Amino acid sequence: KEKVAVLTDGKGGRIPIHDVQISYEKLWTSMTTYMEYPMQWKLFVPELQLDLRVKAAFSAQEFATVLVQGGGFYEGRVTVTGSRQGKAVSGKGFIERKNHTTFTDTEGLLKNVGRFVRQKLAEMYPLEPPSKQWMDKYVLGRNATAGTDLQKVCDTLFKPVRALTDRGGKSWRSLILVSSMNALSKDYVDCSRYIALSELLHVGSLIIDDIQDESVVRRGGKCVHIDYGVATAINAGCGSYFMAASLSGIDDHPPAVQLQLYNLYFDALRAGHAGQGLDIAGLDHLMPHAVESGEVGHLLDSLRSIHIYKTGGAAGTLCRMACVLTGASTEQANALENFGVQVGLAFQIVDDALNLKGFEGDLKEAGEDIRDGKVTYPVIKALGRLTKADREYVWTILQEHTGDRGKVQSVIDKLKSVAAIEDCLVEARNLIEDAWEPVDRTLPDSLSKLMMRAFCSYLTERTY
């Protein structure tokens, strides 16, 4: 891009100068729009012998608006130091910066969120010990002793987790948490440290899930237990649950707030483990009755409860924690918590449907769940509509755990014939719409609220 400096003299004359060198450093990410903005600049104009350092007076000077691409631009006060013609100069100034790291759709927004989440987790989970004081405060606690190999702690507790988080992820839990906090707050809130709650709770469960499921691939790479061993993976995965509470700074709040946050957090953990236990046990014991009778109400409720305990409940808890942290009303808290629960449930329903439709970019082979014999949302929906002969056929193929592409496709075709897959997507949309109505009514309009709404629409239309 062309760079032009304009010198304005004391009489108001303006002289354009094209030999200009500008560089920037120290990026700041807005928790409203997830756009990055430089906080410091170097400006050098040889013709004027002008060499300046420009620094933002403070970071949160974004102007959030739907009138520009990306939802905002940077506009605020700066301090200036440097030299002109060899003499020291200083002063105050004003800067406006548009579209530094913009996006055009919700997918672009989520990429920005994911990039920031990876950066933040890299800070929170360092591959090398930042200092003994940091390790004592956040990891080892008041029983920290001399002789502890701090690098080994990082190697065994942090490095396995980073192997997974550095690959990225959808990061929608963090988007919901952060957007909830800023939608509830009159002033901008830097809630980046609370990302530890949303991400480490999730990634810890992924590591443990992969061990229990004997999986080998996660996020395009080897599962943590494959590269680091089962023992280390279990320790690092479980450790994430406790590091989340430490790194998010729950103990920095007044005792009454701490108590609410800890109660919510451990409630989500307990329910999540109950859900995982139910998932491990499976739903096969309910299938004979559903296949024989075509009655699927209890079977569907059982799967729905697993999805809520494992995913929806955690998302709802994050929304409720946002309400505690911002002093929201009971009406707002109830609306947002239910919204989080339904978003998590809808996410899992869409996942089940996409597994049969196929993921964009061939991220997974269409029908993996059929091959693995999983009783999923589309399967249950179909069992309530298929003939008894077709129900028996579907159940037979599921029990085979077959890799036969023809058989897998035949089951998918039967599910499609009764619109079971599309009906799952419709149900997910309805869940979101119904849950959004009270949120829309109780939360004041803001860009953060709009970000949440945009994600809701994207959730049920996504292709991966």
Spans of features found by a protein language model:
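Alpha-helical phosphate/pyrophosphate-handling elements in metalloenzyme active cores
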Residues: T145-L197, L247, L300-V343, I380, ...
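Structured soluble/peripheral alpha/beta segments that form catalytic or ligand/cofactor-binding pockets
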Residues: K1-D105
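All-alpha helical catalytic cores of prenyl diphosphate-utilizing isoprenoid enzymes
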Residues: G141-L150, D166-S171, I234-N235, D251-E360
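Divalent-cation-assisted or electrostatically stabilized phosphate/pyrophosphate-binding catalytic cores
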Residues: R218-G239, H289-K310, N334-N338, E360-R385, ...
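Conserved N-terminal diphosphate/IPP-binding helix and adjacent helical/loop segment
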Residues: D105-V203, I207, I211-I226, I280-H298, ...
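Short hairpin/turn module used for nucleic-acid contact or packing/dimerization
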Residues: A57-A122, Q151, I421-Y464
